[in-house]
Curated annotation (Swiss-Prot):
Belongs to the expansin family. Expansin B subfamily. Residues 1-31 form the signal peptide. GO terms for cellular component: extracellular region; membrane. This is Expansin-B10. It comes from Zea mays (Maize). It is a peripheral membrane protein.
């Protein structure tokens, strides 16, 4: 049987072209939008200058973000005071593997037209790793809507992703510093969730001093706003806690953890 070489060659070229096209389609699906490297870490410095960022939102439109009102910092009830659903997931240079938890920022937007241009304060309560901008705030629905003109909140949320500006500010929590002993704590294991710290808001070191001791022992950063200590011997309460904020401020809370402390219990500074 005669073979038409030209026809075969044309067919092969068509098949090769199809394969190449599929490769590019698959690569495009894998690669997605261009990734933007994170910016420099936002430190405990306070000025008048604003930085550019992207803003998105998640959860319920008028909610606190996570369905369980928690988040990557380990806080509970971020829908209640003093957070009041004004939480934000910071990207890498803002969340800082949990060391940015509790820090506070003023945010605002000028566009689209629904933006008020007036700053509102949000708290870092969660994390995001979406590489869409050097700085990215994934906001609770309530916090995103707070940047809008009155009555335009829902229209602004429909924008989905917008340009915004931000700057770090001192925290002014309307609550006392609270230490929550996490579930699983026992005589030889201490895990503290620290929250509502005025000023810098975020913590870089936690130390505890046992009853009758003059020496502070450091806790290790576990995750989010949680710090832990594994001890070879049972810890003797009451425990005094010393906090160091990112800006270097040290605060001491004498005997804040009682001798008969219990897991899954919050103790408030006097």
């Amino acid at each position: 049987m005669a073979v038409n070489v030209r026809t075969m060659w044309s067919s092969m070229r068509a098949q090769v072209a199809m394969v190449v096209a599929l490769v590019f389609l698959v690569r495009g699906a894998w690669c997605g939008p261009p990734k933007v490297p994170p910016g420099k870490n936002i430190t405990a410095t306070y000025g008048k200058d604003w930085l550019d960022a992207k803003a998105t939102w998640y959860g319920k439109p008028t909610g606190a973000g996570p369905d369980d009102n928690g988040g990557g910092c380990g806080y509970k009830d971020v829908n209640k005071p003093p957070f009041n659903s004004m939480g934000a997931c910071g990207n890498i240079p803002i969340f800082k593997d949990g060391l940015g938890c509790g820090s506070c920022f003023e945010i605002k937007c000028d566009k689209p037209v629904e933006c008020s241009g007036k700053p509102v304060v949000v708290h870092i309560t969660d994390m995001n790793y979406e590489p869409i901008a050097a700085y990215h705030f994934d906001l609770a629905g309530t916090a995103f809507g707070a940047m809008a003109k009155k009555g335009e909140e829902e229209k602004l949320r429909k924008a989905g992703i917008i340009d915004m500006q931000f700057r770090r500010v001192k925290c002014k929590y309307d609550s006392k510093v609270t230490f929550h002993l996490e579930k699983g704590c026992g005589p030889n294991y201490l895990a503290l969730l620290v929250k509502y710290v005025d000023g810098d808001g975020d913590i870089v070191a936690v130390d505890v001093k046992e009853k009758g001791s003059d020496t502070y022992e450091p806790l290790k950063h576990s995750w989010g706003a949680i710090w832990r200590k594994d001890s070879d011997k049972p810890l003797k309460g009451p425990l005094t806690v010393r906090l160091t904020t990112e800006g270097g401020t040290k605060s001491v809370y004498d005997d804040v953890i009682p001798a008969n402390w219990k897991a899954n219990t919050a103790y408030t500074a006097k």
